[in-house]
Amino acid sequence: MARTAATKLALVPLVAAMLLVAADAHHLRPGELCLGPLRRLRKRQRHQPSAGCCSGVKRLAGLARSTADKQATCRCLKSVPARTTPAGPQASPPGAASASPTRSAPVSTALRSTDRTRAPHISSDRRLVG
């Protein structure tokens, strides 16, 4: 009887630690970021984003909470070719989708500031970068 009580007391912190790790283990993956509606918006040169675009932007704003999630989101958004960058009303689908951005700076500035959080590294021409 004493052994089972001791075993239970030893297992409770272990299970609690496992639950905390499992809760923190979910990070955004590139597959979770659906940029298709944004690309279609840019190609059609529409003034209003589609419902799919708005829901994707709102979902993305809700999912990117940790620094790692925000960095993954920035990397994904940076991977979109520059030639599809919208102009005019399409330039800010988050605003049109009523999603509040977490920063007031332009996206390019916000992305540059997250790049600075990386550790310095040596570039191909042997200069210290970072």
UniProtKB/Swiss-Prot annotation:
Database matches in InterPro entries: Bifun_inhib/LTP/seed_sf, Bifunc_inhib/LTP/seed_store, Plant_nsLTP
Single GO BP term: lipid transport
Induction: By low temperature and drought.
Region forming the signal peptide: 1-25
Gene3D superfamilies documented for this protein: Plant lipid-transfer and hydrophobic proteins
Bias (Basic and acidic residues) ranges: 113-130
Family annotation (SUPFAM superfamilies): Bifunctional inhibitor/lipid-transfer protein/seed storage 2S albumin
Region (Disordered): 80-130
One Gene Ontology term of the molecular function aspect: lipid binding
Keywords carried by this UniProt record: Signal
Compositional bias ranges of the Low complexity kind: 84-110
Tissue: Shoot meristem.
Listed SMART domains: AAI
Task of the protein: Possible dehydrative stress responsive protein. Not shown to have lipid transfer activity.
Family: Belongs to the plant LTP family.
Protein name per its UniProtKB record: Protein BLT4
Organism: Hordeum vulgare (Barley)
Organismal lineage: Eukaryota, Viridiplantae, Streptophyta, Embryophyta, Tracheophyta
